[in-house]
Amino acid sequence: GAADMGTGCDTTLAQIAAEVLDCPLDNITVFGADTDTSPYDSGSYASSTTYVTGKATEKCAMKLRGQICKLGAELLECTEDEVEFDGKDVFKSKDPTQKKSLSEIAYASQFGHMVPLEATETHTSPLSPPPFMVGAAEVEVDTETGEVKLLEFDACVDCGTPINPNLTRVQTEGGLLQGIGMTLTENITYDKNGYPEENSLFQYKIPARTDVGKIKVEFESSYEPNGPFGAKSIGEVVINTPLP
């Protein structure tokens, strides 16, 4: 139910599910914005998608994994404690040659059983562990005109354990650019009648990548036990840091 607005959450949520189910990422399909197939989600905002929706995804995948093991154990005529699942087969721990493939288990769930293999979970976090970030900017200032040129911005972020380091880095770089634009170039003014004078992107100047110098991003890894695989959020913190 979480909408991917450019943050890459469809990929991140698929990675979480694939990790739990021990399957390739290509085996996971995300219906992120289809109310006919996906459950209600509070929205992709407030630094909550990976931390909250990601945890719901992890819990849901764990429940589905448990159902797979349970049905596999029934087909193998043993208890759940006696089997393991490697993403392809459910097999007996003491005799791996006795196994049932995932396709066999899926077939059995549709024929001869009243309930198919499916799971639904909800998650609300009792905590909101903050991410941390430090930033340093090198600027060049024209003392006569007041023009400020950003030469380099260095950032180090603690967002727990990044689920997808590449997407996390891009999210950080994009957020930094938004914060830099808010600080240096973006402004709204109003005429005497109260109408905004910046009514298009020709007047409202947002920075392009070529308007800033080097942007360097590093991560200080930590582990948040309440997040999916140790992840925390990384949304507002990367926008807010350049502002001071």
Please identify what each model-predicted range represents:
Residues 15-244:
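C-terminal catalytic domains of large/alpha subunits in multi-subunit enzymes
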Residues 10-11:
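Conserved strand-to-helix beginnings and helix N-cap segments that scaffold or border functional pockets
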